Amino acid sequence: MIKIIITDDQDIVREGLASLLQLREELDVIATARNGQEAFEKAKELEPDIVLMDIRMPVSNGVEGTKLITSSLPSVKVLMLTTFKDSALIAEALEEGASGYLLKDMSADTIVKAVMTVHSGGMVLPPELTAQMLNEWKREKQLKGINEIEKPNELLDLTEREIEVLAELGYGLNNKEIAEKLYITEGTVKNHVSNIISKLAVRDRTQAAIYSVRYGVSVF
């Protein structure tokens, strides 16, 4: 059973989502929280598998909460709850180690599937939101007088197969899914991911996925 903490400053959202998810026998909502700091404190105490985290909250927002959790509790995954207006904050949360994000108005089935994906080691990156984030990154560059996002030299150090694996990381796939798609073993995927993280000098697979999206390896 997957243990979950739900974090949102709005009572109706927090309790409503908790009630919906508690109906699923594979999920156990062990606590709720009103802000990022409270989520962190409860995560330390209760050791959940996943924290569902709203982005915009008073006292301590979702980015701050994500940073606290991922830096101190590496076994706990964070999945962001957001709206289309929060793409800048989503990017910050991903850079702090969140395993993906969902729109708040998505169906319970979609949220459950996302939780299962994150729990199995994958990421959740809805294409429509990811494309919007990418467009904002491009727009930021254009405002600075740069027409295209230049690809870093580190990408040249990757093998063709590592580039393929990196692209799939950007689409949110876990090792098993990548192995099936590329017709290689999970162990081989794991080795490729380790090499990618080392060569790109990123912290983890989440950072590698962001890198892949930002520099156009994963195309949306």
Curated annotation (Swiss-Prot):
Instruction: Provide the Response regulatory domain boundaries.
Output: 3-119
Gene inactivation effect: Deletion mutant does not show any observable phenotype.
Modified how: Phosphorylated by LnrJ.
Question: Could you tell me which residue ranges the HTH luxR-type domain spans?
Answer: 151-216
UniProt cross-references to SMART domains, sorted A to Z: HTH_LUXR, REC
GO CC terms for this protein?
cytoplasm
**Entries under InterPro entries matching the protein:** CheY-like_superfamily (IPR011006), Sig_transdc_resp-reg_C-effctor (IPR016032), Sig_transdc_resp-reg_receiver (IPR001789), Tscrpt_reg_LuxR_C (IPR000792), WalR-like (IPR039420)
**Could you tell me the Gene Ontology terms of the biological process aspect for this record?**
phosphorelay signal transduction system; regulation of DNA-templated transcription
Q: Which residues carry this modification: 4-aspartylphosphate?
A: D54
Localization (cell):
Cytoplasm
Which PROSITE patterns does the entry link to?
A: HTH_LUXR_1, HTH_LUXR_2, RESPONSE_REGULATORY
- Role this protein plays: Required for resistance to linearmycins, a family of antibiotic-specialized metabolites produced by some streptomycetes. Member of the two-component regulatory system LnrJ/LnrK, which induces expression of the LnrLMN ABC transporter in response to linearmycins and other polyenes. Probably binds to the promoter region of the lnrLMN operon and directly regulates its expression. May also promote biofilm formation.
Protein name from the UniProt record: Transcriptional regulatory protein LnrK
Q: Which organism is it from?
A: Bacillus subtilis (strain 168)
